[in-house]
Amino acid sequence: MSTILKWAGNKTAIMSELKKHLPAGPRLVEPFAGSCAVMMATDYPSYLVADINPDLINLYKKIAADCEAFISRARVLFEIANREVAYYNIRQEFNYSTEITDFMKAVYFLYLNRHGYRGLCRYNKSGHFNIPYGNYKNPYFPEKEIRKFAEKAQRATFICASFDETLAMLQVGDVVYCDPPYDGTFSGYHTDGFTEDDQYHLASVLEYRSSEGHPVIVSNSDTSLIRSLYRNFTHHYIKAKRSIGVSAGESKSATEIIAVSGARCWVGFDPSRGVDSSAVYEVRV
């Protein structure tokens, strides 16, 4: 299943491997929403999907709230505005208008993602979207993906929050999947960078949440730092293709780590009040 957005680090291509390490549970919690590829490819009873990027979360909320209105407005924009001057006018309004509604900002965000250079999402220090025009002949309008997303989104809660804030909201039995900005390859985290200190802090919080009994699964690049930070997790290695961030028309592969916390019990979780599954889960390797 493809996603609404083009997105750096999109997990669609590796989903068959990633799903092997996602155990059953009443809710999947994702502190780094990205393209929502994991939500779309899994079947948890409910989801808590978070991201620090308010434009991303606003898009998801607006599609979930009124899919048909969103499709109707966005389709028109795709039909009439595939021109460089239109792109920069829309980007200007997206960045600076004080009168733009949240609904139209969501429509513009999809437009900018699909018409901007290589689907990148980048902001300057002032918080302004600054990706140049992509000059594509016929940008794809993801109507089918929007409808599928809107259906699945009825099981989800979307919040604009940091990973700290999101992980503080865990409930008994929650499964945690984290796909943070990758070490050594990508530093963008909305307007601020995602530093080595952030990697250390995230790993510390995830170690603690794992010790509480939460299944924790983390994707990241295969670097010495990541192997060290998640040394108490089981490591699985996969090859993933990269297309965003390399020369146009090219792709390359890189090794990624899927770090999986050890199997634990869901202490205090009563399946009779939630999903019909065992109180003990087993990570499949």
Swiss-Prot record:
**Keywords associated with the record:** DNA replication, Methyltransferase, S-adenosyl-L-methionine, Transferase, Transposable element
Q: Name one GO biological process term.
A: DNA restriction-modification system
Domain of life where this protein originates: Bacteria
Q: Which reaction does it catalyse?
A: a 2'-deoxyadenosine in DNA + S-adenosyl-L-methionine = an N(6)-methyl-2'-deoxyadenosine in DNA + S-adenosyl-L-homocysteine + H(+)
- A Pfam family of this chain: MethyltransfD12
Q: Which residues form a coiled coil?
A: none
Enzyme superclass (EC): transferase
**Per the UniProt record, which EC number(s) apply here?**
2.1.1.72
Q: Where are the transmembrane segments?
A: none
InterPro entries per UniProt: Ade_MeTrfase_dom_2, DNA_methylase_N6_adenine_CS, M_m6A_EcoRV, MeTrfase_D12, SAM-dependent_MTases_sf
- GO molecular function list: S-adenosyl-L-methionine binding; sequence-specific DNA binding; site-specific DNA-methyltransferase (adenine-specific) activity
* Binding positions for S-adenosyl-L-methionine per the UniProt entry: 7, 11, 51, 179
Instruction: Spell out the NCBIfam families in the cross-references.
Output: dam
The function of this protein is: May play a regulatory role in the functions of the retron.
The text of the family note is: Belongs to the N(4)/N(6)-methyltransferase family.
Name listed for the protein in its UniProt record: Retron Ec67 DNA adenine methylase
Q: Which organism is it from?
A: Escherichia coli
The lineage is:
Bacteria, Pseudomonadati, Pseudomonadota, Gammaproteobacteria, Enterobacterales
